[in-house]
Amino acid sequence: MESIGIVAPHKMHFTEPLQLQNGSSLAGYDLMVETYGTLNAARSNAVLVCHALNASHHVAGVYADNPKDIGWWDNMVGPGKPLDTDKFFVIGVNNLGSCFGSTGPMSIDPATGNPYGAAFPVVTVEDWVNAQARVADQFGITRFAAVMGGSLGGMQALAWSMMYPERVGHCIVVASTPKLSAQNIAFNEVARSAILSDPDFHGGNYYAHNVKPKRGLRVARMIGHITYLSDDDMAEKFGRSLRRAEGAVDAYNFNFDVEFEVESYLRYQGDKFADYFDANTYLLITRALDYFDPAKAFDGDLTAAVAHTTAKYLIASFSTDWRFAPARSRELVKALLDHKRTVTYAEIDAPHGHDAFLLDDARYHNLMRAYYERIANEVNA
């Protein structure tokens, strides 16, 4: 199926201070935005797609100057795709604190004339949602037909339905969770520790030293990447295969160089990530993941936390996702059904672990296509 083709991002500047959950505020900030499709006259066909940890506003299509830079959810969004841009106006927003053009640690702090670095304020999922709401205001969108996201993006979609219930028709939460488990927080802490202990980190102000803490960022990515894959998927892809040149003896080298194919793969992923991502951003986003817990204000009662929601929900999980296991999605489903919300739940049998939400799986995409067709019918009614 064809891509949406060449797209171009644009930068929105906001001068009104954004109050943050930590008590501080951003006096002025930029958000990178990308749109696909056409907003109808009633402004009723808009869908917001929220991104996960290392993604951005570039949801679909390609850039004219870099045709290899394909949008991170290009198989989901586009003409004739499950989220059909012939029917919907789709918005992607790069979150505050990211490193892809929105205001973040790499941006210049107007108070000092230097990059924010470690001084950039800690942000939360709720802060992102409030910033995204201002983007919607700029487009004159008072209500989204749907807000959708996978993983961390799913947390944002859920937060939208709780913080702005009157502005969300459908909330689509994929491979996500209403809060991180202790195990997930632990993985994030180990990843952050790898970055913080890198000699090139310099307390987060490594820009002034013209270096990057690549060693720490590389290890952080390797840790994270393991959690995105299932055991079965890793066994099928790599097994215990040794990394050897064609025709070489299939025997151990008895040293600490790369021996196994899975080691080579993880190092490749770590190296690639360290080349394009920012370490301070990684710290910020993983901490935002840790802090997300809308039930906390209700003494841990998720049912109470979702009491004032009004959206219809599609919640999808994957059988082999152990990062955000199906049990976490079922917990959310139960809380919503306790209030008799309209909920569609699908637990998809897929071997690819957490990353399954990014892949072109027929059952998964058929589910999304059918659900968006239902939304399109509502929009056109």
Swiss-Prot record:
Coiled coil: none annotated. Transfers a succinyl group from succinyl-CoA to L-homoserine, forming succinyl-L-homoserine. It catalyses: L-homoserine + succinyl-CoA = O-succinyl-L-homoserine + CoA. GO terms for biological process: homoserine metabolic process; methionine biosynthetic process. Substrate binds at R221, D355. It is found in: Cytoplasm. Homodimer. Pfam families: Abhydrolase_1 (PF00561). Gene3D superfamilies: 1.10.1740.110, alpha/beta hydrolase (3.40.50.1820). NCBIfam families: homoserO_Ac_trn, PRK00175.1. InterPro entries: AB_hydrolase_1, AB_hydrolase_fold, HAT_MetX-like. The record marks R323 as: Important for acyl-CoA specificity. Residues 45-360 form the AB hydrolase-1 domain. Belongs to the AB hydrolase superfamily. MetX family. Keywords: Acyltransferase, Amino-acid biosynthesis, Cytoplasm, Methionine biosynthesis, Transferase. This is Homoserine O-succinyltransferase. Its main location: cytoplasm. It comes from the Bacteria. GO terms for molecular function: homoserine O-acetyltransferase activity; homoserine O-succinyltransferase activity. The active site is at S151, D321, H354. It comes from Paraburkholderia phytofirmans (strain DSM 17436 / LMG 22146 / PsJN) (Burkholderia phytofirmans). GO terms for cellular component: cytoplasm. The keyword DNA-binding does not apply. Pathway: Amino-acid biosynthesis; L-methionine biosynthesis via de novo pathway; O-succinyl-L-homoserine from L-homoserine: step 1/1. PANTHER family: HOMOSERINE O-ACETYLTRANSFERASE (PTHR32268:SF11). The keyword Amino-acid biosynthesis applies. Its EC number is 2.3.1.46.
